[in-house]
């Protein structure tokens, strides 16, 4: 199954084609044609064959529809209700997820939803603080991937690289002893709920004063409305997230990222599996 890309750090977009809609339409069209042939067109060809004493050839479109419908239907069900693959094309979730990672997103962790339309069919669970989640931002049809930081009703404050939730500072410690190959990265670890999240900021030098500064991204204070979530990228200084475009409504949830199953940055590279892991 082809993997969709998610979350370009500057624009946080992936692709203009609505693949679930295309897949649903293709499945419906081939299914209707296959059903019509079973109920009516096939019988008519059989009558014509007996009348003219020769076999009437099955039209190409019917032949192809009957061949593709079972495959399309299976893919549609799996991608809609079980799991869906995505590709990470940027660094807004570094250091945990890097450009070229292929991830598997569970479609049932937060309940079963109507394909394309997003209406909840069966409620199973709710997002937890620290989950890595795929979703649609408000008023944007493109897929994003971020970490759940704020739950409905939470008071969120982010200043001087310190995250505070409901008046309590989130435990943060620098990752000492971890090799940092890129000199502009500042790494730390946050404890969000039951998750330990590795995060990073951009370290730069002020051209006017030559002083070292760490760009931690937009700061502010927010109250999460009911039925919404506050999302942040792990790469705090290079992520367009709820700090800039607001809260994610529950109906926009796509699924929970559960595993990295391959790394393949470009067509000229060889796919690797050394980053494969389950995500906490």
Report residues per predicted region.
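Internal/C-terminal transmembrane anchor helices
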Residues: 52-83
């Amino acid at each position: 199954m082809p993997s969709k890309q998610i979350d370009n750090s500057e624009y946080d977009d992936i692709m203009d084609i609505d693949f679930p809609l295309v897949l649903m339409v293709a499945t419906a069209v081939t299914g209707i044609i296959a059903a019509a042939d079973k109920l009516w067109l096939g019988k008519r060809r059989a009558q014509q064959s007996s009348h003219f004493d020769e076999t009437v050839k099955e039209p190409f479109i019917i032949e192809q529809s009957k061949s593709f419908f079972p495959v399309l239907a299976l893919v549609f069900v799996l991608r809609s209700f079980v799991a869906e693959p995505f590709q990470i094309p940027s660094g807004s979730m570094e250091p945990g997820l890097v450009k070229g990672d292929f991830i598997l997103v569970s479609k049932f962790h937060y309940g079963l939803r109507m394909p394309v339309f997003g209406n909840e069919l069966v409620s199973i669970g709710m997002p937890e603080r620290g989950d890595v989640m795929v979703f649609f931002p408000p008023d944007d049809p493109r897929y994003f991937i971020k970490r759940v930081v704020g739950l409905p009703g939470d008071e969120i404050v982010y200043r001087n690289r310190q995250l505070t939730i409901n008046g309590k500072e989130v435990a943060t410690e620098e990752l000492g002893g971890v090799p940092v190959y890129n000199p502009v990265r500042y790494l730390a670890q946050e404890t969000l709920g039951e998750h330990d999240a590795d995060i990073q900021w951009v370290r730069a030098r002020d051209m006017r004063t030559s002083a070292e500064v760490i760009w931690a991204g937009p700061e502010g204070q927010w109250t999460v409305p009911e039925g919404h979530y506050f999302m942040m990228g792990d790469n705090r200084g290079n992520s367009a997230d709820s700090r800039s475009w607001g809260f994610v409504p529950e109906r926009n949830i796509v699924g929970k990222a559960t595993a990295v199953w391959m790394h393949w940055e470009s067509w000229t590279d060889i796919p690797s599996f050394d980053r494969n892991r389950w995500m906490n």
